[in-house]
C-alpha cells in the first residue's frame, strides 16, 4: 500500500530532524517519494510524526497465562498507546528457554499481533539461575536479549559466565535488580510509610546491591549489561559512575517511577503494588535527573497484566505489577516534556533511537528513508480521561485509572499499515 502523511511535523531524534513535511510509505518502507497517487492520504496538520515507539520490557503472558493477556490483546493495547514494537519477557509458562517456544511466540505474533513482538530469552535454563541457556540457539531462533526477569541471577559466577557468553552474540543481559533475601516477604518500599501501614518493606539496597554487583561483573567481562526498571536514587548514581568509567551498561526506568511515590500506597490500592516498589520523592527526582543527563537510556512499561480477582485481595497477597501500554506516552508527555525535564525529541529518543541502538534493531528507531515504516502520530492537544471501560488490555490493573491526560497517540502505523487510530 502507498501511504502519504501530509503537512505533518516530523521529529526524528536520531537524525536530529524537526520540520514540517510529508512522509511517503510504499511496500512497508519509508521512501523519499513515489510516482503517482497514494492509496491513502492522512492529513497531518497540527500533529507530530515520530519513529514508532519501542517498549523493551513487557509481559504478554502467552503462552500459559492467557486469562491475563494474550499476544493479540497485548499488542492491541500497545497499538492504542502508540507502541509499534514490544519486547516480551520470558517468564511465561513454559518459560522462553528453548527455540520452539521462541518460534511459538514469533509465529503467534505474526498471525495475531498488531505490532512487532520480539522475545527475550531466559538467561538460564528454566530461569533457575543454575545452568546457562543455549543462547546461540535462542539467538538463531530470534531473541533480542536474555534475562531471568523477575529473578536475579543470584550466583555471581553464573552471572559472570552469562555476560561472557552473550558477548559472543552481541546480546545484552537484562538484569533484574533485586536481592531476594533482602526483599523477602516485602510488599512496598521500606520506610516511614511501610511502618505506618504495617506492611513489610523492601529496602532500596535490595535493588542497589545487585546492580552494584552486576556493574562490577560487566566491567570484569566487558559484557553488555542492561539494567531493568531502575527505581532508586542510589541505582541512578551507580549507573552514572559506571558510565563515566566506560563500562558497557545501559538502563531503563518506567513511568510510575518518575510519576508516583509510595505515599499513594496509603489507600491500600493493590494497583500501586509493583516490583520494584514505588519509592520516595527524592528517588523520583533522581530518576528524572538520570533521564535528563543520559544516565537512564530508555523508558519502558514493565506492562504486567493481572486479573481483577487476583488484585482484589489483601495488599500482602495481591501480585506485583501494573499495565502500562496505554498510558506510557501520555505520562512521558505530561510528566517529563510539559514540565520541562526533557525536550520532546530527547524524551522520544528513550523509546525510539536509544532502544534500537542498544538492542541492534536494524531498520527501526528512526524515520530514515529505506527503514521499516513504523510510525507513531501524536496530537499534543488530544485530551482524554483514562477510564477502566476504555482499556483494551485484557487486564485493568492500573493506578492511573481516572487520570486526565493531554497529549497522546492518535494513530499507530506498523510496517506501513494503520493498526490503530482515534
UniProtKB/Swiss-Prot annotation:
This is Dihydroorotase. Binds 2 Zn(2+) ions per subunit. Zn(2+) 1 binds at residues 57, 59, 149, 302. CDD domains: DHOase_IIa (cd01317). The keyword GTP-binding does not apply. It comes from Endomicrobium trichonymphae. GO terms for biological process: 'de novo' UMP biosynthetic process; purine nucleobase catabolic process. HAMAP family: PyrC_classI_B (MF_00220_B).
Amino acid at each position: 500500500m502507498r501511504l502519504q502523511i501530509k503537512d505533518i511535523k516530523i521529529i526524528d531524534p536520531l537524525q536530529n530532524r524537526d520540520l514540517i513535511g510529508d512522509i511517503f510509505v510504499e511496500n512497508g518502507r519509508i521512501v523519499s517519494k513515489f510516482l503517482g497517487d497514494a492509496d491513502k492520504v492522512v492529513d497531518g496538520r497540527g500533529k507530530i510524526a515520530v519513529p514508532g515507539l519501542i517498549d523493551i520490557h513487557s509481559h504478554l503472558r502467552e503462552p500459559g497465562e492467557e486469562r491475563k493477556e494474550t499476544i493479540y490483546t497485548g499488542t492491541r493495547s500497545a497499538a492504542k498507546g502508540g507502541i509499534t514494537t514490544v519486547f516480551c519477557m520470558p517468564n511465561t509458562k513454559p518459560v522462553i528457554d528453548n527455540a520452539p517456544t521462541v518460534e511459538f511466540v514469533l509465529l503467534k505474533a505474526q498471525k495475531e499481533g498488531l505490532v512487532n513482538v520480539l522475545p527475550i530469552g531466559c538467561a538460564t535454563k528454566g530461569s533457575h539461575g543454575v545452568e546457562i541457556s543455549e543462547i546461540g540457539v535462542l539467538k538463531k531462533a530470534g531473541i533480542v536479549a536474555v534475562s531471568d526477569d523477575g529473578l536475579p541471577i543470584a550466583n555471581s559466577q553464573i552471572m559472570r559466565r552469562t555476560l561472557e557468553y552473550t558477548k559472543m552474540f552481541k546480546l545484552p543481559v537484562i538484569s533484574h535488580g533485586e536481592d531476594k533475601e533482602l526483599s523477602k516477604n516485602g510488599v512496598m518500599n521500606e520506610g516511614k510509610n511501610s511502618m505506618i501501614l504495617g506492611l513489610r518493606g523492601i529496602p532500596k539496597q535490595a535493588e542497589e546491591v545487585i546492580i552494584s554487583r552486576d556493574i562490577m561483573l560487566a566491567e570484569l567481562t566487558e559484557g553488555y549489561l542492561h539494567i531493568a526498571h531502575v527505581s532508586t536514587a542510589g541505582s541512578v548514581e551507580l549507573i552514572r559512575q559506571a558510565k563515566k568509567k566506560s563500562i558497557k551498561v545501559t538502563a531503563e526506568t518506567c513511568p510510575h517511577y518518575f510519576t508516583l511515590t509510595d505515599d499513594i500506597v496509603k489507600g491500600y490500592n493493590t494497583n500501586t503494588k509493583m516490583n520494584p516498589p514505588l519509592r520516595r520523592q527524592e528517588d523520583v527526582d533522581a530518576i528524572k535527573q538520570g533521564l535528563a543527563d543520559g544516565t537512564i537510556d530508555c523508558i519502558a512499561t514493565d506492562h504486567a497484566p493481572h486479573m481483577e480477582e487476583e488484585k482484589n485481595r489483601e495488599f500482602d497477597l495481591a501480585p506485583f505489577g501494573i499495565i502500562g501500554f496505554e498510558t506510557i506516552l501520555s505520562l512521558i508527555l505530561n510528566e517529563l516534556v510539559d514540565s520541562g525535564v526533557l525536550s520532546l525529541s530527547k524524551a522520544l529518543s528513550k523509546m525510539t533511537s536509544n532502544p534500537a541502538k542498544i538492542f541492534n534493531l536494524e531498520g527501526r528507531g528512526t524515520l530514515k528513508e529505506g527503514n521499516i515504516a513504523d510510525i507513531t502520530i501524536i496530537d499534543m492537544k488530544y485530551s482524554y480521561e483514562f477510564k477502566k471501560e476504555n482499556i483494551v488490555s485484557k487486564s485493568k490493573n492500573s493506578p492511573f485509572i481516572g487520570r486526565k491526560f493531554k497529549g497522546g497517540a492518535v494513530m499507530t502505523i506498523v510496517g506501513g499499515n494503520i493498526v490503530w487510530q482515534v
